[in-house]
Amino acid sequence: MKRFWRWSEPDCRARDETAPDARTLYLEGVIAEDSWFEDDVTPAAFKADLVSGSGPITVWINSPGGCCVAAAQIYNMLMEYPGDVTVKIDGIAASAASVVAMAGTRVLMSPVSTMMIHNPLTVAIGDSEEMRKAVQMLDEYKESIINA
């Protein structure tokens, strides 16, 4: 399965034996809540990879965003991770990826990187009652994003 992330494990030969192992996580591409195609991934699969190691991690993000619910789950997983999490924006952390970026103990951006934050959006179909529900849902998502 193609994933929108990949891990780079530390090179044991080059590692200082007194320093803790550091893993690197690359978040690249669209963040998805459910797997609709082979190139999508669920937060559950992400969690399995996250907890398979320990120690500090560096998260490199280059993502246009994706599903805000999946991003919130990944944000929570990184916030609960027991080691230090350093986030580095490599290119772009847009939309839902900006939420994931806020989970870092430290967040670093180069002068040529971009973070794009916007109000949540959706497509809604239905009568006026359904439209009110959609507006309420968007307002709730906006508040949760602001809290990150």
Language-model region placement:
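Terminal-region recognition feature
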Residues: M1-A148
